[in-house]
């Protein structure tokens, strides 16, 4: 059964956001803003030179408490591995 996302610490990261960021990373995109299925706006930032990855949620132009500062590509990889295990 496919789950709708994963918990990262105390926060829920929706599956559609994970999938979108995975696609952006495959394409080499370093920054993107889009509207998720939840109606929130999401911003992804990646700085490949240092491995920094940040995913921030906005509603009405204001940053929400739902943000994910992975800090490194390794931390993002751990989250993705957890997500992929749920798909099996």
Model-found features: residue ranges?
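Negatively charged, low-complexity tracts enriched in Asp/Glu with abundant Ser/Thr
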Residues: 2-38
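Acidic, low-complexity, intrinsically disordered interaction modules
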Residues: 26-80
